[in-house]
Amino acid sequence: MSYDRAITVFSPDGHLFQVEYAQEAVKKGSTAVGVRGRDIVVLGVEKKSVAKLQDERTVRKICALDDNVCMAFAGLTADARIVINRARVECQSHRLTVEDPVTVEYITRYIASLKQRYTQSNGRRPFGISALIVGFDFDGTPRLYQTDPSGTYHAWKANAIGRGAKSVREFLEKNYTDEAIETDDLTIKLVIKALLEVVQSGGKNIELAVMRRDQSLKILNPEEIEKYVAEIEKEKEENEKKKQKKAS
């Protein structure tokens, strides 16, 4: 039997191949990084080069779901559009029904449940995306969650998805400390440093968004990102000089 063709049939060794293939699609997507700070959440995405005549504003990997929640994704953009639209409708429906915005976990659970349903029904295929979902709850607590094509979700302090996820995650495991997220600027720099592990041409290929407590999503413009990149490069040079002095 061809187990890799049927979505709802397990292989003898317990695999759902269509779900695993969807996870492979995620690994080919642009790298996305999320970091939860003290009073800020930051999303960063590797920005692929666009055609000369293409309007780059139409190629967005970070989007708001509600005033207090946003997400970045890696994988198939067309699949992400469906998930984003469904999540936005759910956020609005929740506001109308309960008269309160959604919690970050609520909308993450909704997205994860939507993905899971597409792994268990005929005539559909799994969504080929992973998502990093960030935001603030009513009490001002910052949150970061990650979902994958199988419908599982987890809370994180910092995480990465996409083609460079492994090396970026290793960087974050080494460098994520209480000191590294002490201020908003330090948290933003941590995300940029993590992305620079896989992005070759500096700040021009990075898309960055920040959300602060009681403030809506802000997409940083290229000049702001370049300013942070220049500061990071300067810090690197100073550290190298200090090392050379110690060695001599």
From Swiss-Prot:
It comes from the Eukaryota. Glycans are attached at residue 130. GO terms for cellular component: cytoplasm; cytosol; extracellular exosome; nucleoplasm; nucleus; proteasome complex; proteasome core complex; proteasome core complex, alpha-subunit complex. This is Proteasome subunit alpha type-7. It comes from Homo sapiens. The 26S proteasome consists of a 20S proteasome core and two 19S regulatory subunits. The 20S proteasome core is a barrel-shaped complex made of 28 subunits that are arranged in four stacked rings. The two outer rings are each formed by seven alpha subunits, and the two inner rings are formed by seven beta subunits. The proteolytic activity is exerted by three beta-subunits PSMB5, PSMB6 and PSMB7. PSMA7 interacts directly with the PSMG1-PSMG2 heterodimer which promotes 20S proteasome assembly. Interacts with HIF1A. Interacts with RAB7A. Interacts with PRKN. Interacts with ABL1 and ABL2. Changing residue 112 to D: Found in patient with severe intellectual disability; uncertain significance. It holds the Pfam family Proteasome_A_N. Its main location: cytoplasm. It is found in: Cytoplasm; Nucleus. Component of the 20S core proteasome complex involved in the proteolytic degradation of most intracellular proteins. This complex plays numerous essential roles within the cell by associating with different regulatory particles. Associated with two 19S regulatory particles, forms the 26S proteasome and thus participates in the ATP-dependent degradation of ubiquitinated proteins. PROSITE patterns: PROTEASOME_ALPHA_1, PROTEASOME_ALPHA_2. Phosphorylation by ABL1 or ABL2 leads to an inhibition of proteasomal activity and cell cycle transition blocks. Changing residue 153 to F: Displays impaired G1/S transition and S/G2 progression. The keyword Cytoplasm applies. One of its GO terms (molecular function) is identical protein binding. The keyword Transmembrane does not apply. Induction: Down-regulated by the ribozyme Rz3'X. Up-regulated in colorectal cancer tissues. Keywords: Acetylation, Cytoplasm, Glycoprotein, Host-virus interaction, Nucleus, Phosphoprotein, Proteasome. The modification Phosphotyrosine is found at residue 153. Belongs to the peptidase T1A family. The modification N6-acetyllysine is found at residue 227. GO terms for biological process: proteasome-mediated ubiquitin-dependent protein catabolic process.
